[in-house]
Design a protein with these regions (language model features):
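Positively charged, phosphate-engaging catalytic surfaces used for nucleic-acid and nucleotide handling
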Residues: 1-167
Length: 167
């Protein structure tokens, strides 16, 4: 029972995440990863990552859909998530019992109220396929990144060489 419950919870959160992403940019989380992860693009298409802006991109960065969103998309996603969480908090404060199925229905109504298109299915790309694709692109990008990367030590040595050339 616990496994089924946790599986149901994971599916619920994946559904909410995908509907929110779709409302903002017309793609599920997995679809945005597959559409934007590209080893030929600057920073592999990522707009943010754990060690941004000057640190290296690591494998775990590339399978996070939010990392591919621009500032405006990210702001809009955060805004719509915050509005929905505020609504959920208000429902809880009013002691209104809700099942996960109720929350899915309320989410669709909330998105329609906000005049955005509502995702009706699970999307065209699974999370597993998106992760595999992004990690494959990362393996190609890592070679490029390593050739361009300048460590702090390298920067220090280059600065010292420049200073020696000036003096």
């Amino acid at each position: 029972m616990l496994f089924r419950s946790s599986q149901m919870t994971r599916e619920f959160y994946a559904t909410v995440q995908n509907k929110m992403h779709y409302a903002v940019h017309g793609n599920t989380a997995a679809e945005v990863i597959v559409a934007r992860a590209d080893h030929n693009k600057e920073h592999m298409g990522l707009k943010s990552w754990k060690n941004a802006p000057d640190g290296k991109i690591v494998k775990t960065d590339v399978s996070i859909a939010k990392n591919y969103l621009g500032k405006e998309e990210l702001a809009e996603l955060n805004e719509i998530v915050t509005m929905y969480l505020d609504y959920a908090t208000r429902q809880a404060r009013r002691h209104i019992p809700m099942t996960m199925e109720d929350w899915k229905t309320k989410l669709d109504a909330f998105l329609r109220f906000n005049d955005v298109e509502v995702l009706q299915d699970k999307g065209k790309v699974t999370a597993a396929i998106a992760k595999e694709f992004a990690e494959s692109e990362f393996e190609k990008y890592r070679v490029i990144q390593d050739s361009l990367y300048e460590s702090d030590f390298d920067k220090l040595m280059n600065d010292m060489e420049k200073n020696d050339a000036i003096h």
